[in-house]
């Protein structure tokens, strides 16, 4: 292995993305002509994301549904409902924040034609038509609603298949996830090309747009962590929720912020649950499950970035469509775990509700990677700390009822 590759392997992806980001800004300011010529790096990265996203959603969802263990949720139904309520509430907060503080992105719309929906009826009609699309056509044209429908359908059918078949599906899922990891490893180069060319063409206004977007995202996550989650916990335990909320943020959220992985934070959450004296039979199931489906941060990311694209393109959004987006974002978020940049790669699915084509949706995904250094850390901190918070709230409420 060459010294360069050794350094590359030792340096974390976050550090590489920061270096790519700073190098892109520097090049755009010092040599705008060269920066414009390097736009192809960003285009290659976005094309790779476009290629892998439909296959990723199809295989991942199918494997998840096919390998679901029957009866898993029966022990933890109250916690499961808290997870779903928290994720939906986060999406609603993100919708209102995006309406109050609309973000505008520097997107290239020349390569695609827009077909904005007329209202909720048309959105639902398009949703139904997309859901019954030919599966091969859905994969080719990145029709994520169709891909999702076929993935769930096949997953349910394969539940009754033999163990060997389900193992093959799981292996396929691992293979696709590995390919996604390889694509994500090229994020620093892609971001370097995207930032340098965008700044060279649009000036510093584009960067200020990203800062505004990041402020909306982090603001939503803080609001959910410090206002919405405590309200849900108070409704459950009927006493001051803040000691428990702040304990979970301090003990679980800070670790998750730096590891940027809900899965890596599972041992931390299990240890905290034990210290809180919760039932082991409950938390040993609910914490790993929460790392998979409790995705309030992902719901915020999907909603805010989708509505940023909508505002940039001048598409009008009525209230029923915004509520539908909240539901779709919450459902999408549940499938975003375990994949690097998972929530970002599900943005095209939400964008398709508004008739935004894949070419533009993937530019929004690329913007997500640019701000991902902070966005992903904050998202993981919210997701993981909420796992242990809702588990503790449900266990304490159960004790109060029986005590």
Swiss-Prot record:
GO terms for cellular component: plasma membrane. PANTHER family: PROTON/GLUTAMATE-ASPARTATE SYMPORTER, SERINE_THREONINE TRANSPORTER SSTT. GO terms for molecular function: neutral L-amino acid:sodium symporter activity. The lineage of its organism: Bacteria, Pseudomonadati, Pseudomonadota, Gammaproteobacteria, Pseudomonadales. The gene is sstT. GO terms for biological process: serine transport; threonine transport. Belongs to the dicarboxylate/amino acid:cation symporter (DAACS) (TC 2.A.23) family. Keywords: Amino-acid transport, Cell inner membrane, Cell membrane, Membrane, Symport, Transmembrane, Transmembrane helix, Transport. It holds the Pfam family SDF. SUPFAM superfamilies: Proton glutamate symport protein. It comes from the Bacteria. It catalyses: L-serine(in) + Na(+)(in) = L-serine(out) + Na(+)(out); L-threonine(in) + Na(+)(in) = L-threonine(out) + Na(+)(out). This is Serine/threonine transporter SstT. InterPro entries: Na-dicarboxylate_symporter, Na:dicarbo_symporter_sf, Ser_Thr_transp_SstT. It comes from Pseudomonas putida (strain ATCC 47054 / DSM 6125 / CFBP 8728 / NCIMB 11950 / KT2440). The chain crosses the membrane at residues 14-34, 44-64, 79-99, 138-158, 175-195, 214-234, 295-315, 327-347, 353-373. Involved in the import of serine and threonine into the cell, with the concomitant import of sodium (symport system). It is a multi-pass membrane protein. It is found in: Cell inner membrane.
């Amino acid at each position: 292995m060459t010294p360069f590759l050794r350094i590359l392997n030792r340096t974390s992806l976050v550090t590489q993305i920061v270096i790519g980001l700073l190098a892109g800004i520097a090049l755009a300011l010092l040599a705008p002509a060269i920066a414009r010529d390097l736009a192809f790096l960003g285009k290659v990265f976005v094309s790779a994301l476009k290629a892998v996203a439909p296959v990723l959603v199809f295989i991942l969802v199918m494997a998840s549904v096919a390998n679901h263990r029957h009866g898993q949720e029966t022990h933890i139904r109250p916690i499961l409902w808290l997870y779903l309520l928290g994720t939906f509430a986060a999406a609603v907060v993100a919708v209102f924040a995006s309406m109050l503080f609309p973000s505008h992105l520097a997107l290239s719309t020349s390569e695609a034609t827009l077909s904005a929906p007329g209202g909720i009826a048309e959105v639902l009609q398009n949703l139904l038509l997309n859901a019954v699309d030919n599966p091969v056509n859905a994969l080719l044209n990145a029709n994520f609603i169709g891909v999702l429908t076929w993935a769930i359908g096949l997953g349910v059918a394969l539940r009754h298949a033999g163990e060997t078949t389900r193992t093959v599906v799981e292996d396929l899922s691992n293979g696709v996830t590995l390919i996604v990891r390889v694509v994500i490893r090229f994020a620093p180069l892609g971001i370097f090309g995207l930032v340098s060319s965008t700044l060279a063409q649009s000036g510093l206004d584009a960067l200020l747009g990203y800062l505004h977007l990041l402020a909306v995202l982090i603001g939503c996550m803080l609001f959910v962590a410090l206002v919405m989650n405590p309200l849900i916990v108070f409704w459950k335990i009927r006493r001051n929720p803040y000691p428990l909320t702040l304990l979970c943020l301090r003990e679980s959220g800070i670790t998750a912020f730096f590891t940027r992985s809900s899965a890596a934070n599972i041992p931390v959450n299990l240890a905290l649950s034990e210290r809180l004296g919760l039932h082991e039979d409950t938390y040993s199931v609910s914490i790993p499950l929460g790392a998979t489906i409790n995705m309030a941060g992902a719901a915020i990311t999907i909603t805010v970035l989708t509505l940023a694209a909508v505002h940039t393109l001048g598409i009008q959004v009525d209230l029923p469509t915004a509520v539908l987006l909240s539901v779709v974002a919450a459902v999408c978020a549940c499938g975003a775990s375990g994949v690097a940049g998972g929530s970002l790669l599900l943005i095209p699915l939400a964008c398709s509700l508004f008739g935004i084509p894949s070419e533009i949706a993937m530019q929004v995904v690329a913007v997500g990677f640019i701000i991902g250094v902070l966005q992903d850390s904050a998202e993981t901190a919210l997701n993981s700390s909420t796992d242990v918070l809702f588990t503790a709230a449900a266990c304490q409420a159960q004790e109060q009822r029986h005590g």
